[in-house]
């Protein structure tokens, strides 16, 4: 059976991949894409979906499911890249960030999680003090990072007062550092404990210094799946409600979807549909981030991981379906550098940030990158190698540096594969 390494070598080295990349790169007009699709044998359903996408029309729930069940990778890549280039051209975004993970101790017992430890397993975990967390932040004094990403387990002593004080202390120490922190899983827990509603809680967090919310904790919204893999924590409806209250304050957030485990294709589309509906109402989401299920060191180790082909199909369908989301992100640390590069031709326009080996959430689940860290130079080169323009952004997608004409000294490609370069 082919593994992901074999798939990647086949894709990168295949002449069909080179032709495909050369055909779709810069193919951002309707006529150009229609010409490519006219040379293929498509079902009536796929022709109708392509027509909708190329003319800016929204595809339906049923059409989303049909794409998962019937569309081939090449077709999806052409359409997803069309949407990507309509929105962003060749621009690919990244940021300079670091993660702050207060604890891996957690009151919840999610079946897919390789990171957390229950409170009864304290000897296997950590719980940082406020001072220790601030010491981590201070390590980056003088460094050109723009964001601290705070997320971890749910621990009872980390309550509304604790996180409010933490956010305030970070902003007082370094006002220019954007605080992106906690998911609705944490917020639901601490607000319930404090006996305050979501609207009040989110207002308090904003006043304390919170500036945006990451997309974690979404998993799969539908209770048919959620009750099996994460039954104890907030429901899909509660997750969405917390983001909606945050958006009402004029603030921004991201959204994720955990795919490739026990869910069916229609569960994925249901998940994206709920996000799309909320985005129609609030416009507060910036980025949609599909997260690949990893099966190491968790209670779902018997579930096989999906292939890189399915990863790329999923990114492409997400880009096609999530028409009101500006950005689709691939976490390079989770899927590998090579797959992240491939994803840039399947709808992805953001590959996250430098990380600086500050997260254990990916590596403990068996991610490709066990010590996730890349310099700015490495990230820029990674993007340029596949013919895209590297843009350093801040959390809100303001441009920090356009690296289009920047050439680093001793710019080299990794030796373990050779990518076709598109001019």
Language-model features: locations:
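Polybasic, lysine-rich low-complexity intrinsically disordered segments
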Residues: 3, 9-10, 23
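Auxiliary Fe-S-binding modules of radical SAM enzymes
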Residues: 20-74, 141, 279-423
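Conserved, mostly hydrophobic/aromatic
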Residues: 56, 80, 110, 150, ...
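N-terminal pre-triad scaffold of radical SAM enzymes
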Residues: 65, 75-119, 125-151
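Conserved Radical SAM active-site core
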Residues: 66-67, 117-257, 261-270, 274-278
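Hydrophobic faces of well-ordered beta-strands that scaffold small-molecule active sites
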Residues: 92-98, 148, 179-183, 213-215, ...
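Glycine-rich, proline-tolerant flexible connector loops at the mouths of alpha/beta enzymes
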Residues: 98, 151-160, 223, 296, ...
């Amino acid at each position: 059976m082919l593994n992901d390494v074999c798939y990647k070598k086949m894709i990168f080295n295949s002449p069909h991949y080179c032709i495909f990349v050369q055909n779709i790169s810069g193919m951002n007009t309707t006529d150009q894409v229609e010409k490519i699709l006219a040379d293929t044998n498509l079902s009536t359903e796929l022709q109708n979906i392509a027509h909708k996408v190329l003319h800016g029309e929204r595809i339906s729930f049923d059409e989303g499911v049909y794409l998962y069940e019937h569309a081939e990778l090449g077709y999806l890549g052409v359409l997803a890249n069309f949407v990507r280039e309509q929105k962003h051209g060749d621009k690919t975004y990244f940021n300079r960030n670091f993660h702050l993970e207060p604890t891996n101790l957690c009151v919840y017992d999610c079946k897919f999680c390789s990171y957390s430890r229950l409170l009864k397993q304290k000897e296997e975990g950590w719980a940082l003090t406020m001072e220790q967390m601030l010491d981590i932040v201070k390590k980056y004094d003088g460094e050109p990072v723009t964001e601290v990403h705070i997320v971890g387990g749910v621990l009872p002593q980390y309550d509304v007062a604790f996180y409010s004080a933490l956010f305030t202390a970070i902003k007082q120490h370094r006002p220019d550092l954007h605080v992106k922190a906690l998911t609705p899983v944490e917020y639901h827990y601490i607000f319930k404990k404090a006996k305050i509603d979501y609207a009040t809680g989110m207002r308090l967090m904003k006043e304390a210094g919170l500036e945006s919310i990451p997309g974690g904790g979404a998993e799969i919204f539908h209770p048919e799946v959620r009750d099996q893999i994460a039954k104890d924590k907030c429901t899909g409806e509660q997750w969405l409600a917390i983001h909606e209250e945050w958006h009402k304050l004029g603030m921004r957030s991201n959204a994720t979807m955990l795919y490739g485990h026990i869910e069916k294709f229609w569960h994925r589309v249901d998940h994206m549909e709920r996000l799309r509906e909320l985005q129609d109402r609030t416009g507060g989401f910036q980025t949609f981030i599909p997260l690949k299920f990893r099966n190491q060191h968790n209670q779902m180790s018997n579930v096989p991981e999906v292939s890189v082909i399915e990863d790329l199909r999923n990114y492409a369908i997400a880009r096609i379906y999530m028409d009101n989301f500006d950005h689709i992100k691939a976490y390079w640390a989770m899927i590998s550098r090579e797959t992240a590069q491939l994803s840039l031709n399947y709808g992805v326009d953001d590959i996250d940030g430098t990380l600086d080996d500050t997260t254990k959430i990916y590596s403990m689940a068996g991610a490709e990158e066990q010590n996730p860290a890349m310099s700015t130079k490495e990230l820029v080169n990674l993007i340029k190698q596949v013919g895209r323009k590297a843009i350093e952004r801040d959390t809100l997608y303001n441009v920090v540096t356009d690296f289009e004409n920047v050439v680093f000294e001793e710019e080299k490609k990794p030796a373990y594969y050779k990518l076709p370069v598109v001019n």
